[in-house]
Amino acid sequence: KFVLADRAPGFGDPAKPKPVLYSLSYLTPTESDNPNISFNQLMISFDVELGEGNPGAIGVDHQGAQGTATEDVHVEATGAFAGFRGTSGSGGGVSHISVRGGRYGLYLDATDPFASYAGSQPSPVISAVELTGQTEKSIHAATRGPLTLVGAAIDGPGIHLAGRPSDWDGALNVIDS
């Protein structure tokens, strides 16, 4: 279990959200975070608690491509920004995750300092997701390609599709939910 201390420095500004756990890849020693070359990175079987007084906190930021997966990860985000930011696609996946609380359960959009990236790799599939008690939107999505939810249980303010500039981006498939 990963626990963020109450009122932790650097996690107090929701205009500049910041993840507790963040995976990335490097192009060069000075050029980091290119999700389309983040391969075979796994985040499996753990819990994250975002503490009190951390309105800018995100539990997990894990966006990658082939072989990248997030499985059996659960975030307590009451009073925080979001449980998850970014998601895998292109041969990766997300399964058996949950978020309780937060402004957003899943915030699938770009944030600074990497605002040019979409909120996902192409065509993300998220299965067996449970989102409860969010205050703004359960899911905010600006994905590359369609977002597919399978077996989603959402008890909160719904899904917002933010759209992207290309016609093939931003669609939503909801299956057995």
At which residue positions do the language-model features occur?
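Extracellular/periplasmic carbohydrate-active domains that bind, remodel
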Residues: 1-177
